[in-house]
């Protein structure tokens, strides 16, 4: 092989390398930036964000980045544009303080499902003795609960409302014992096994109502409000930049019975496995949550 031929082959190889490199760079440049979805380590939220993430990646080929942090940090990051949306804003009561603080920099994409919060007790606690939050002041009742109100993380919306309930109902001698979702429920489970009473901050939908027989206490002062709605909230301007994603969240729906069943399945295996199986079985329903015209433009 003479030098001229060798030179031509090397030149062709070099140019081919440049072409492939340019093609790869162009493809990389055309890739969509990820939608950053914030979430809190709550059982219902994990199912919701992972179902949404699966659907977005499947139907829109939309990369998704999940960012986990406490709810207060999520609101601040959303308002500052450091994340794009959070699908677990409980209104009108639970997250009212956070929402009121940042609402001018947020977009409400819609309601995903409904819920409820409040103080709850196992059904083994007689209704005749404790039916209402007011009954916690009856003689001898505080001692049966060891003066404890078990709650999840300190400082979240429900924790703040419970502080208000202690003040408004004048629950003298009661203290909030904050830990985590699992810590709160583990202590309640230990108490049940020892035939001890428990008073907990509960919310639904949640798998706790499937595993244990619980009931909410009446709340005549409506500190915890009535029915709650769980909203998907985005940063300002998100729906204009990502209309197809905003449309999906505006049409996202998940029956409460399905959500609670998924949470139980996640405990028995993993959330990823539960979500994958549910999504595969309900793929057609999720397809209906997208706008066909917007989807065709994004592909």
Regions found by a protein language model. Give the residues of each.
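Immediate post-signal peptide segment of exported/extracytoplasmic ligand-binding proteins
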Residues: 27-37, 138-146, 285-299
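Short, well-ordered beta-strand elements
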Residues: 31-44, 62-67, 146-150, 249
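Ligand-binding cleft/hinge of the Venus flytrap
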Residues: 52-61, 135, 140-176, 280
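A conserved helix-loop-strand patch within extracytoplasmic ligand-binding domains
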Residues: 104-155
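An extracytoplasmic/periplasmic, membrane-proximal ligand-sensing/linker region
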Residues: 46, 161-193, 206, 227-229, ...
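A ligand-binding cleft/hinge motif common to bilobed small-molecule-binding domains
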Residues: 87-101, 190-215
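Short helix-initiation/N-cap motifs at beta->coil->alpha
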Residues: 42-43, 64-77, 176-187
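A bilobed periplasmic-binding-protein/Venus flytrap-type ligand-binding module shared by bacterial periplasmic
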Residues: 117-127, 229-242
């Amino acid at each position: 092989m003479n030098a001229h031929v060798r030179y031509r082959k090397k030149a062709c190889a070099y140019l081919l390398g440049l072409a492939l490199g340019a093609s790869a760079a162009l493809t990389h440049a055309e890739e969509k930036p990820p939608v950053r979805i914030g979430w809190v380590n709550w059982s219902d939220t994990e199912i919701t964000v992972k179902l949404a993430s699966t659907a977005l990646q499947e139907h829109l080929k939309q990369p998704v980045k999940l960012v986990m942090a406490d709810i207060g940090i999520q609101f601040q990051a959303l308002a500052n544009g450091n994340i794009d949306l959070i699908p677990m804003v409980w209104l009108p009561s639970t997250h009212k303080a956070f929402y009121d603080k940042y609402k001018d920099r947020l977009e409400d994409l819609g309601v995903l499902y409904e819920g409820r919060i409040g103080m709850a007790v196992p059904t083994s606690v007689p209704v005749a003795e404790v039916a209402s939050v007011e009954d916690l002041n009856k003689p001898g009742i505080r001692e049966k609960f060891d003066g404890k109100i078990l709650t999840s993380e300190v400082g979240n919306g429900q924790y703040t409302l419970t502080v208000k309930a202690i003040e408004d109902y004048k629950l003298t001698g009661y203290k909030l014992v904050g830990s985590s979702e699992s810590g709160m429920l583990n202590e309640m489970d230990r108490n049940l096994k020892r035939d001890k009473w428990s008073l907990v901050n509960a919310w639904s939908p949640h798998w706790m109502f499937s595993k244990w027989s619980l009931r909410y206490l009446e709340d005549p002062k409506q500190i915890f409000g009535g029915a709650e709605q769980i909203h998907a909230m985005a940063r300002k301007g998100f729906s204009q930049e990502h209309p197809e994603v905003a449309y999906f969240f505006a049409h996202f729906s998940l029956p409460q019975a399905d959500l609670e069943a998924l949470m139980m399945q996640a405990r028995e295996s993993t959330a990823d496995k539960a979500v994958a199986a549910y999504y595969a079985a309900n793929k057609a329903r999720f397809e209906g949550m997208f706008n066909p015209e917007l989807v065709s433009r994004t592909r």
